[in-house]
Amino acid sequence: MTRRPVSRKRRATHGTGPGEQSDWDHSAHKRKRLQPEKKSLVFYLKSRELKPHNDSTYLHLLRGHAACTLPGILSEREFHLGNLNKVFASQWLNHRQVVCGTKCNTLFVVDIQTGQITKIPILKDREPISGSHQSCGIHAIEINPSRTLLATGGENPNSIAVYRLPTLDPVCVGDGGHNDWIFSIAWISDTMAVSGSRDGFMALWEMTDEVVNKRDFQHGLSRVPVYSHISHKALKDIPKESSNPVNCKVRALAFNGNNKELGAVSLDGFFHLWKAEQTLSKLLSTKLPFCRENVCLAYGLEWSLYAVGSQAHVSFLDPREPPQCAKSVYCREQGSGIRSVSFYEHIVTVGTGQGALLFYDIRAQRFLEDLTGSCREGDLLKLNTGKGWLNHNEMWMNYFSDIDSCPNAVYTHCYDSSGTKLFVAGGPLPTGLHGNYAGLWS
């Protein structure tokens, strides 16, 4: 008996044309039939090699394999941001949109498919800020665990501004807590966030149901966006451990949700640990192994480690271990500093002031090497950011006119939920230079 041939052709589905902007119509997506999830070539090849005992172990192994394989095959696509100055902070909103904050105090969303930039109105204090006020820009953007609220800086860089997700409608402004710029923010629960400031204090803010519901009620009565103003629930100062209290500025925060502990790095070269629940209670302070330019901090939940960036090293701290047990790795970026750091699986991604991305394997305790064959054996895998945009201003004319461009410091980077896309942004490292860089590595 001969088999009848079976046609495997399928009707083409109607989709959005290339370059078109899609709206945030969640109800429309619910009505559509879900398409089968696409698996990468790496997924299928690894699935033949591995025979796990259960799905969770299987997926964990695949994610770990992808984490150390993908950096070597990532390619860059730059975005044009106009004349914005230095992107300091970024977070993924969804699979195609990233929200960013800049030194020129601009909050915007970039669509990674179309490259379209949408600016978001920044929120103001109760009282107008003085005309002589100089803004340092937006240094922090953080999303709460349920991804319903986003916290960042306001028009006044001393204040914290909270927006609702996914609409980015304003919710409230926390003002009056700091008298200097906010450098970092960390959510310690769905409704409570901590801000760390250059004034040496950490402020605890609570977004109560009353605040959120009040905003909803007012918004229903007016077509003009309205928002509440809140005061801090607690205010704690960083211990003045060094001989120069002026340097006790809170530069970076990272939260350990399992132990309810908040790590903080101050510019005097100390790491501080706080119990963070309904208030902040100090647990310890310890001197960092390398204490110059400690401007970034991340927590790796799976490894129970804090990673701290310095001028040329990344130090790994386990609060349960004595300070002398801290391990530090040299990043071969002497002088430019480590500007951003993050954990994804067992890979720590490091962004430098010279516009490079490095990848450290915690399990192997070494940086990933370049295996493309284009470099010498033993050379580190290094992704270099593109040219970006540079304003040829007076500073450039006086000191940098002999060069057309300069490296873009990686002030911020973040992986999407799949771990296969890496958004990278920043700008020129010298203070007086005006420029920007943003790119998607995938």
Swiss-Prot record:
Pathway: Protein modification; protein ubiquitination. One of its GO terms (cellular component) is centrosome. Its main location: cytoplasm. Signal peptide: none annotated. Residues 1-31 are annotated as: Disordered. WD repeats lie at residues 132-173, 177-215, 245-284, 333-370. The keyword Cytoplasm applies. One of its GO terms (molecular function) is ubiquitin-like ligase-substrate adaptor activity. PROSITE patterns: WD_REPEATS_1, WD_REPEATS_2, WD_REPEATS_REGION. Gene3D superfamilies: YVTN repeat-like/Quinoprotein amine dehydrogenase (2.130.10.10). SMART domains: WD40 (SM00320). The keyword Repeat applies. GO terms for biological process: protein ubiquitination; regulation of autophagy; ubiquitin-dependent protein catabolic process via the C-end degron rule pathway. Residues 1-13 have a biased composition (Basic residues). InterPro entries: Beta-prop_DCAF12 (IPR056151), DCAF12 (IPR051191), WD40/YVTN_repeat-like_dom_sf (IPR015943), WD40_repeat_CS (IPR019775), WD40_repeat_dom_sf (IPR036322), WD40_rpt (IPR001680). It is found in: Cytoplasm; Cytoplasm, Cytoskeleton, Microtubule organizing center, Centrosome; Nucleus. Keywords: Cytoplasm, Cytoskeleton, Nucleus, Repeat, Ubl conjugation pathway, WD repeat. Component of the DCX(DCAF12) E3 ubiquitin ligase complex, at least composed of cul4 (cul4a or cul4b), ddb1, dcaf12 and rbx1. Substrate-recognition component of a DCX (DDB1-CUL4-X-box) E3 ubiquitin-protein ligase complex of the DesCEND (destruction via C-end degrons) pathway, which recognizes a C-degron located at the extreme C terminus of target proteins, leading to their ubiquitination and degradation. The C-degron recognized by the DesCEND pathway is usually a motif of less than ten residues and can be present in full-length proteins, truncated proteins or proteolytically cleaved forms. PANTHER family: DDB1- AND CUL4-ASSOCIATED FACTOR 12, DDB1- AND CUL4-ASSOCIATED FACTOR 12-RELATED. Belongs to the WD repeat DCAF12 family. This is DDB1- and CUL4-associated factor 12-B.
